[in-house]
């Protein structure tokens, strides 16, 4: 299927690993001009080189910036003033008991996971409306619907992203601009894979055994019964970014492996 993304300018934040990297690679495969972002120039170079190696026709540029700050967001907008597609993917997570989540933790998670997308959307959405075409996607999580007790601060930010995406979509009424959120389920990103591997080692079991036990005990509602691969999420995001997805607007698109049981 041709997703009609040839020549579209796309910024994927937090691009150097996991879901963000997979999205950037998929958009590059579809012919989009992709802007790669991370906090350090070294990681941007590494990600760009890897995508170029895997996608022969990739058209990439990199912008290192810390999007957890207003200054970092301003830097990106200054270096890339025009976008067709904005994928707000950058994010952090950390399992932590509620009693031990400090004020600084709450503020950091909100700054990185929520305000990065707010600031960039505020910068790019007006011009998208003026040109009567654009795509903004927030990479939220099933944790935004089913708040994990072990990561309440993380779940809060994912719920906020869903709300912001819906609210921004309401402002695009009658235009060809769409704003959506995509809700991955448990995904085998590098960070999650390392986390799972460490826990499996601590519990003296294989990674495969731990994965089985994880879905049995921690995510029993999963229909998929395995970790989702980053490229599977990227496939969904690429379609949502496509002109073919013009009827999808204000939606919380689930790619959660069936973890969320509710229909609505």
Regions found by a protein language model. Give the residues of each.
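Alpha-helical segment proximal to the catalytic Tyr-Lys
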Residues: 126, 170-171, 246
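Residue(s) in the substrate-gating loop at a strand-loop-helix junction
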Residues: 141
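Active-site helix of classical SDR
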Residues: 121, 157, 165
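Conserved glycine-rich cofactor-binding loop
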Residues: 9, 16-17
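Substrate-binding pocket helix/loop in short-chain dehydrogenase/reductase
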Residues: 97-98, 105-110, 218
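Short, small/polar-rich loop/turn modules that mediate ligand/substrate recognition or access, typified
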Residues: 173, 178, 248-250
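Short C-terminal tail/terminal secondary-structure segment
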Residues: 146, 237-238, 244, 249-264
């Amino acid at each position: 299927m041709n997703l009609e993304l040839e020549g579209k300018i796309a910024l994927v934040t937090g691009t150097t690993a996991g879901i963000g990297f997979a999205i950037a690679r998929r958009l590059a495969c579809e012919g989009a001009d992709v802007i790669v972002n991370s906090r350090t120039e070294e990681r941007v170079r590494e990600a760009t080189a890897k995508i170029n190696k895997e996608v022969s026709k990739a058209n990439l540029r990199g912008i290192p910036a810390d999007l957890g700050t207003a200054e970092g967001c301003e830097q990106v907008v200054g270096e890339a003033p025009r976008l067709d597609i904005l994928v707000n993917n950058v994010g952090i997570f950390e399992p932590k008991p509620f009693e031990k989540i400090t004020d600084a933790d709450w503020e950091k998670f909100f700054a990185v996971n929520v305000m990065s997308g707010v600031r960039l959307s505020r910068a790019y959405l007006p011009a998208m409306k003026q040109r009567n075409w654009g795509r903004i996607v927030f990479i939220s999580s099933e944790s935004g619907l089913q708040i994990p007790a072990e990561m309440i601060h993380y779940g809060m930010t994912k719920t906020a992203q869903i709300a912001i995406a819906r609210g921004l979509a309401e402002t695009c009424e009658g235009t060809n601009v769409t704003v959506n959120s995509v809700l991955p389920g448990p995904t085998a990103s590098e960070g999650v894979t390392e986390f799972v591997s460490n826990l499996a080692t601590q519990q003296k079991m294989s990674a495969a055994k731990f994965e089985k036990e994880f879905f049995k005990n921690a995510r029993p509602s999963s229909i998929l019964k395995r970790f989702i691969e980053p490229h599977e999420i990227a496939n969904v995001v690429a379609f949502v970014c496509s002109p073919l997805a013009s009827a999808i607007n204000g939606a919380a698109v689930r790619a959660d492996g069936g973890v969320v049981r509710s229909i609505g």
